[in-house]
């Protein structure tokens, strides 16, 4: 989306319209210019300070102040994309479509990206927002045939430049969410069609707990981490996230909620934590749970770096101690997710 800052996106991983073809944003960094704790400025790349380069690919702001990114660019003219809104009677077909995309379509056509979100929209009730993007100026490519066959109540898809399409994506939330309070949460699972239905049904079963709160607009999204994305993560020695093609395809369940009254925060947080707990329990029972937590969607009650796996955490800590022996960025730099301190707030509602 247009308001997202590039540095944080890249340091936390970075999912884009092009991830199915090229990997995440962190996998397409040629080099980082970093001011280390000692004041030494280094350029980390696959051939220089390679250990620091690896750590910065998903390790967040734990290793220094990144002052410059050099990214591997590629030519892009116009592309196609946008979003379509579907009513509740289409939910089974929408879930079938994202399942087929995650397991089959995304491997056959790496130019494609697809995210499905669910919410209660004022005046419309239960809706599914399907965001589809294609890295060519081709409308309704065959990889999206299952979605193309459905009849939306709103369709703003079209051909345009990347900047136009990212601005258009902001239309996925009510206009009055600007200035609201906001919280995001996520969890990851093996792609499973039954779990898709379970998480959507769980979300709507709990909506009454928050639907009457002032300005409340919660959503839940299914974002596939495709075979192409997982393969792209292995470039240049791999990243720090601990994900491999053997673990896929997987998907991120991303939940967000905007609201306007600070007094409602506890209710909103309890609503989201309850969904997480219920879906995690169901996924574990089905054998499709995955520990990974995407840093850029994580709440303050989560520890994304721990989800990278014990070996990667140990390696990240080693890199941190090498370039920051006094642990300035672990102990004096406030905020965000540290390497081995757990969730910023360990008291999940």
Residue ranges and their predicted role:
Residues 1-349:
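Soluble FAD-dependent oxygen oxidases
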């Amino acid at each position: 989306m247009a308001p997202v800052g590039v540095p944080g996106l890249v340091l936390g991983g970075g999912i884009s319209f092009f991830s199915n073809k090229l990997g995440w944003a962190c996998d397409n960094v040629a080099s980082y210019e970093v001011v280390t704790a000692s004041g030494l400025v280094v350029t980390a790349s696959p051939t220089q300070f390679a250990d620091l380069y690896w750590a910065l690919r998903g390790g967040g702001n734990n290793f220094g102040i990144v002052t410059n990114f050099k990214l591997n660019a590629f030519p892009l003219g116009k592309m196609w994309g946008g979003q379509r809104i579907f009513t509740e009677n289409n939910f089974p077909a929408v879930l079938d479509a994202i399942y087929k995309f995650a397991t089959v379509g995304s491997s056959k056509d790496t130019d494609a990206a697809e995210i499905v979100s669910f919410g209660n929209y004022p005046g419309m009730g239960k809706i599914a927002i399907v965001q589809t993007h294609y890295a060519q100026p081709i409308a309704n490519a065959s990889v999206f045939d299952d979605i193309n066959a459905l009849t939306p109540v709103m369709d703003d898809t079209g051909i345009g430049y990347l900047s136009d399409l990212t601005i258009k994506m902001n239309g996925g939330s009510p206009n009055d969410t600007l200035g609201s309070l906001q919280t995001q949460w996520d969890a990851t699972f093996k792609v499973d069609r039954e779990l898709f239905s379970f998480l959507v049904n769980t979300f709507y079963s709990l909506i009454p707990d928050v639907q009457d709160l002032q300005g409340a607009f919660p959503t839940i999204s299914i974002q596939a981490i495709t075979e192409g994305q997982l393969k792209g993560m292995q470039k240049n020695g791999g990243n720090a996230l601990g994900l491999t093609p053997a673990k896929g395809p997987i998907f991120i369940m991303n939940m967000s909620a905007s609201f306007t009254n600070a007094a409602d925060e506890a209710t909103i947080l309890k609503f989201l934590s309850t969904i997480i707990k219920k879906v995690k329990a169901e996924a574990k029972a089905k054998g499709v749970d995955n520990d990974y937590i995407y840093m850029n969607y994580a709440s303050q009650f989560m520890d994304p770096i721990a989800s990278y796996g014990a070996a990667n955490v140990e390696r990240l800590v080693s890199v941190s101690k090498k370039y920051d022996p006094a642990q300035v960025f672990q102990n004096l730099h406030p905020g965000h997710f540290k390497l081995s301190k757990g969730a910023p707030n360990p008291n999940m509602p």
